[in-house]
């Protein structure tokens, strides 16, 4: 029969394994692990570039000051800087995004499957919110002004909307993953390739199939660049 000390040791080992399993991104085991995007090695993230080939440019991205176009249907542009743009972010568990909103523009309901987001308003006003998981689906929302900060928990559906019909808005978001991912809800549901059966969606949304067919025929705008 196993001794109490053996059970304690097993519990500690299981806790350590569980902690590693739920960690958002792999933690660094050295000063840095610049992503080698050309390596044939397949890992969760990227293999490390040989440190002797690393230079300051691997940790650098030119200024995000130019105002992107906001002429798409939703009236916003998300300029994401993640490990694909700054390879030095590999294993560091962070990325950043600038979001530009036209008057009455929005960053439509979406989720980041691998990251929590913290958003700061740089210019203008934003109405923001997130919805909790089933069964309550509670909406937490707030009107933010310049300098205000709001947090969107990992994996939850959230949005931002510029309520001003005359002035644009700008926000900066930090995300707790080198590659947070983004799933825009309408795009995923109505713009999937191949499309989800209209029988399934009609029952899910409790509408006529003709309504689903019309929605699936629309062009679902991608505002992430």
UniProtKB/Swiss-Prot annotation:
InterPro entries reported in the protein's UniProt record: Cupin_1, Germin, Germin_Mn-BS, RmlC-like_jellyroll, RmlC_Cupin_sf
The keyword Heme is assigned to this record: no
Keyword Transport: no
One GO cellular component, as annotated: apoplast
Residues annotated as signal peptide: 1-23
Disulfide pairings: 33-48
Pfam family, one: Cupin_1
Function according to Swiss-Prot or TrEMBL: Plays a role in broad-spectrum disease resistance. Probably has no oxalate oxidase activity even if the active site is conserved.
Family label: Belongs to the germin family.
Subunit structure: Oligomer (believed to be a pentamer but probably hexamer).
Misc. remarks from the entry: Member of the 12 germin-like protein gene cluster located on chromosome 8 in the major-effect quantitative trait loci (QTL) for fungal blast resistance. Partial suppression of the 12 germin-like protein genes increases susceptibility to the fungal pathogens causing rice blast and sheath blight diseases.
Stated name of the protein: Germin-like protein 8-7
UniProt lineage: Eukaryota, Viridiplantae, Streptophyta, Embryophyta, Tracheophyta
Gene: GER6
């Amino acid at each position: 029969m196993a001794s109490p000390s053996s059970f304690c040791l097993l519990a500690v080992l299981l806790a350590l394994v569980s902690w590693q399993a739920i960690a958002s991104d792999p933690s660094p085991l050295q000063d840095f692990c610049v992503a080698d995007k050309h390596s044939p090695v397949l890992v969760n993230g990227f293999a490390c570039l040989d440190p002797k080939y690393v230079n300051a440019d691997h940790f650098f991205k030119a200024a995000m000051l130019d105002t992107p176009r906001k002429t798409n249907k939703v009236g916003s542009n998300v300029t994401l800087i993640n490990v694909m743009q700054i390879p030095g972010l590999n294993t560091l568990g962070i990325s950043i995004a600038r979001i530009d909103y036209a008057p009455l523009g929005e960053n439509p309901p979406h989720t980041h499957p691998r990251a929590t987001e913290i958003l700061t308003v740089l210019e203008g006003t934003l109405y923001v919110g997130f919805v909790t998981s089933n069964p309550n689906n509670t909406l937490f929302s707030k009107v933010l002004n310049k300098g205000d900060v709001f947090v969107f928990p990992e994996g939850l559906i959230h949005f931002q909307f510029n309520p001003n019909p005359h002035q644009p808005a700008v926000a900066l978001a930090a995300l707790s993953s080198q590659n947070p991912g983004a799933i825009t809800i309408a795009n995923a549901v109505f713009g999937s390739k191949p499309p989800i059966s209209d029988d399934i969606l009609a029952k899910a949304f409790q509408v006529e199939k003709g309504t689903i067919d019309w929605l699936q025929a629309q062009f679902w705008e991608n505002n992430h660049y």
